[in-house]
Amino acid sequence: MEPPVQIFRGEPGPTCSPSTCLPPNGSGWFPGWAEPDGNGSAGSEDVLLEPAHISPVILVIITAVYSVVFVVGLVGNSLVMFVIIRYTKMKTATNIYIFNLALADALVTTTMPFQSTVYLMNSWPFGDVLCKVVISIDYYNMFTSIFTLTMMSVDRYIAVCHPVKALDFRTPLKAKIINICIWILSSSVGISAIVLGGTKVREDMEVIECSLQFPDDDYSWWDLFMKVCVFVFAFVIPVLIIIVCYTLMILRLKSVRLLSGSREKDRNLRRITRLVLVVVAVFVVCWTPIHIFILVEALGSTAHSTAALSSYYFCIALGYTNSSLNPILYAFLDENFKRCFRDFCFPIKMRMERQSTSRVRNTVQDPAYVREVDGVNKPV
């Protein structure tokens, strides 16, 4: 997810600056929009924008999207975590990483109701403590998600290009240890967000905002520093590592017709690699627009128009939508997840199918039956 920075603003006066007109949403705490109250700078001359020019339809659509993300994301990711814990066969190294990704996504979907509320109220009504928690979750999700996807790509690279080393490296235990390390590393940002996050009364607009509170004298510098660090360490470097890993894997897959001694193992290897690639690609597609938007705004090159602000809203919504897409991808692209999902959702039907399959198998293998020349099974 994207980093929290600026959160929510209240009803402006007759006119407002582009930054002030930004939506009062959860995405508002992305470190993408500097406060126009003297603590930050918009990076360019303010262009007055009538509030009426920002259609309320946009806020309604975004709120509806957040509601869908909340339901689908929370239920879907919780189901993913459940099947990995419940079924022994699902406890593979790759699925341990998927569990970590689902945990981060499930956490951030719990913030959707708060963000939707502030979209509609134009102010943060939930207090200082919850403000810190929500901002921290946003940062944790952003860093743990991209770090986990990076490790999944490295894991696939080792499995495809170094199958011998993979026997020692690719174990569920080591995957769990790496997941713990990812959360510890992400805590350097998440805990900082808890310390710096808080509510602030905007007296000029008579509303409460939830944001990272930088020192007034150096607000612009810290705001820019945060945006650049997030862009570099939570996007550029991980994506470059992922690109290198998959480039090497593609070269390997093209040069070798059979990666392992078994065609079945080879199919599974390619299937899992394809699944991870699709998950990574969807993440990059969902998050690239808002990362670019925030970086451009930080450099002071954003066009402060209604179209630009509307694009900003939808870029953020697209990023959060990613948290609800992964369970759907698993269900369509991975047979094991699909089977476990069906087993959980339709236990009676699946039990009857297994019993039917078992009876057919036992009938075929029953020594009381012999196969005649015409191919018909008849009892002896």
Swiss-Prot record:
Keywords: Behavior, Cell membrane, Disulfide bond, G-protein coupled receptor, Glycoprotein, Lipoprotein, Membrane, Palmitate, Receptor, Transducer, Transmembrane, Transmembrane helix. One of its GO terms (biological process) is regulation of saliva secretion. It comes from Bos taurus. A lipid is attached at residue 345 (S-palmitoyl cysteine). Glycans are attached at residues 25, 39. Residues 86-95, 155-173, 248-274, 334-380 are cytoplasmic. G-protein coupled opioid receptor that functions as a receptor for endogenous alpha-neoendorphins and dynorphins, but has low affinity for beta-endorphins. Also functions as a receptor for various synthetic opioids and for the psychoactive diterpene salvinorin A. Ligand binding causes a conformation change that triggers signaling via guanine nucleotide-binding proteins (G proteins) and modulates the activity of down-stream effectors, such as adenylate cyclase. Signaling leads to the inhibition of adenylate cyclase activity. Interacts with NHERF1. Interacts with GABARAPL1. GO terms for molecular function: dynorphin receptor activity; G protein-coupled opioid receptor activity; neuropeptide binding. It comes from the Eukaryota. It holds the Pfam family 7tm_1. Disulfide bonds join 131-210. It is a multi-pass membrane protein. Residues 1-57, 120-132, 197-222, 297-311 are extracellular. Its main location: membrane. The keyword Transmembrane helix applies. PANTHER family: KAPPA-TYPE OPIOID RECEPTOR (PTHR24229:SF1), NEUROPEPTIDES RECEPTOR (PTHR24229). This is Kappa-type opioid receptor. The chain crosses the membrane at residues 58-85, 96-119, 133-154, 174-196, 223-247, 275-296, 312-333. Belongs to the G-protein coupled receptor 1 family. One of its GO terms (cellular component) is neuron projection. The gene is OPRK1. It is found in: Cell membrane.
